[in-house]
Amino acid sequence: LENNSALQQIIPYVWIINPREKKVFVYKRASGKQNYNETRLMNKVSCGIGGHIDREDSANPIENAMIRELMEEIKMENYPKPKIIGYLNDDSDSVGKVHFGIVAIAETFEDVKKGDKEMAEGKFYNVEEFEKILNDSKNEIESWTRLSWPFIRDYLT
């Protein structure tokens, strides 16, 4: 299924935001096949925490997958319930052709730390700081992050 564009897999994609400080959690994906399951996204800058829906998520698959992915990929004291804000269908690259995104936000006032080996580093940035990252040609930005950013920015400002 992972490479069959006729059957897109649904992927929760959760932005972690601090609405009071108007900041977003930004991270760089790990490099090296030993650290990362999805090699097509290695070393890219991303704001979406997410992944495939698993059988264990079956009772409420989308919400359960969002929470499970947050707990796997980041560390924080309390995991907020994400709110779905939209959908993403991006056929511009090999990853997007086989996935359909459910974009959500998780609001927190807590500190967030990287959780697993798939994330090289991560921290909160304000809108202006993140837009500098987006516009810096040295950074390879994940397409879903770039496509959903205008909606997140509007939400924060």
What are these regions (language model features)?
Residues 71-78, 103, 109:
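Helix-driven interaction modules
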Residues 23-72:
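Conserved Nudix-box catalytic region and its N-terminal flanking loop in Nudix hydrolases
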Residues 21-29, 111-118:
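Short, well-ordered strand-loop elements centered on a beta-strand within folded domains, enriched
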Residues 77-86:
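A short coil-to-beta-strand element that immediately follows conserved catalytic motifs
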Residues 22-25, 81, 101-102:
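Conserved active-site beta-strand-loop modules that form the wall/rim of enzyme catalytic pockets
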Residues 1-22, 29-34:
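Acidic, metal-coordinating catalytic segment for phosphate/diphosphate chemistry
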Residues 41-54, 86-157:
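Nudix hydrolase/Nudix homology domain
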